[in-house]
Amino acid sequence: MRTGRPRSFCKDEALDKAIAVFWRQGYEGASMADLTRAMGINPPSLYACFGSKEGLFKAVLDRYDQRRNSFMESVVAAPTVAQVAETFLMGVAGFASDTSGRNPPGCLMLQGGLSCGDTTIPDVLARHRAEKEAILRTRFEQAKEAGELAGNADAAALARYLMVMSNGICVQAAAGATLEELREVAAIALTNWPANAGHKLHQDLTHSPA
C-alpha cells in the first residue's frame, strides 16, 4: 500500500507564520498567495495538509490556543479569585500590546475573524471564546465550593465579565492603545471585581504570556 509523500515542512512553524498573516490581514484579507509565501510552502502542500483556507484557519486557531495554554494555566492556578482576575486581565493587556514585534497588537480571535463571509469560522471562533470562558467559570465554581466566593455568587457572570473586559482591552490595543494605557484600563476593571475588596495589585506587570 502506497503512503503519501512525507511532509517536507514543520507544521507548527508553518502555522505560526500563518497566524501572523491572518492576524494582520484578517481571514478575508489573507490571500492564499500571502499565506503560502509566509509559510514557505506551495499551494498543493497547503491543500494536502489543511484541505482549504478555512481548514488552515481552524488549525491556526488551535495552534494559537496551544500557545496560550500556559497562560490560562497560570491564571487558574492563582491562589485567590481576585488574583485570577488580575492575572488574566493584566496578562491580556501584556500580550495584546506585545512590544516584542513578534505579534501584531490585539488578538487573533477578534481581528483574524473579521469579515469571514459565508463560512463556519464565526461558530469556530465563538467556540474558542466559550472554552476560555468555561475555564474561568469552572475556577470560580471551585472557589464557591471552597467558600472563597459566596454561595450565591454567579460564576458564569464573573467569567463573562472578565471575557468582556479582555475583549475590550484587545480592541483598544489594536486601535493603538499603549501597554500603560491598557494596564490602567485593567486596573479600573479590577476595582469593580466583586470579590476583591481590599485587594492590592501585586503581580509583576511586566509579565505577559508568550
Task: Tell where the protein language model's regions lie, with residue ranges.
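An amphipathic alpha-helix signature
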Residues: 15, 86, 133, 137-141, ...
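Short helix-capping/turn signature of helix-turn-helix
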Residues: 50, 111-118
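Amphipathic alpha-helical packing segments from all-alpha helical-bundle domains
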Residues: 119-146, 157
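Amphipathic C-terminal alpha-helical segment
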Residues: 95-99, 114-115, 142, 162-180, ...
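Hydrophobic alpha-helical connector segments
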Residues: 59, 73-105, 155-162
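N-terminal intrinsically disordered/low-complexity leader segments
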Residues: 1-9, 153, 199-210
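Helix-turn-helix
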Residues: 2, 13, 17, 21-55, ...
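Short, basic, alpha-helical segments at the C-terminal edge of helix-turn-helix-like DNA-binding modules
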Residues: 62-68
